[in-house]
Amino acid sequence: MPYPEIMIRPFREDLTRIGVEELRTPEAVDDAVKNTSGTLMIVVNSVCGCAAGKARPGIALALGNEIKPDRVTTVFAGADIEATDRARSYFTGYGPSSPSIGILKDGELVYMMERYQIEGRGPEQIANELTQAFDKFCAPATMAAV
């Protein structure tokens, strides 16, 4: 049974208010993966404390980086169950984990941050790792070669 929307709305808004696009159906996830040229970040959001105190603030900090994914999206584990399952199907080689953050480049997974990598870190550490991933995988080819 999904979490009540009234309970999770503030957790969704932590990301949507900073411009992260929600994907609420499997079709929306497939569309994002298939129709995003370049890099796509998918955040698996959740109700847990490490999502609230670490992952979401870390993502907000990281999105202030000059280089970032072409498109940033989110699914909500425990609420948008089918969309979350579909997003996780693109995280090849990784088990279900929430919160988690995957970066796909032209539909292929190139970076993954799982829950265990979030739990023991603060928002600044998470942001630092994400910005390193952005710099590596999201920079235009001309910048990446410099």
Regions found by a protein language model. Name each.
Residues M1-S37, C138-M143:
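N-terminal leader/targeting and pre-domain segments
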Residues D31-E66:
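Local sequence-structure signature of Cys/Sec-based thiol-disulfide redox active-site neighborhoods
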Residues A52-P57, T84-D85, P123-E124:
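Conserved strand-to-helix beginnings and helix N-cap segments that scaffold or border functional pockets
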Residues T84-S98:
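Short acidic (Asp/Glu) patches
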Residues Y94-T142:
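Non-catalytic, surface beta->alpha helical segment in thiol-disulfide oxidoreductase systems
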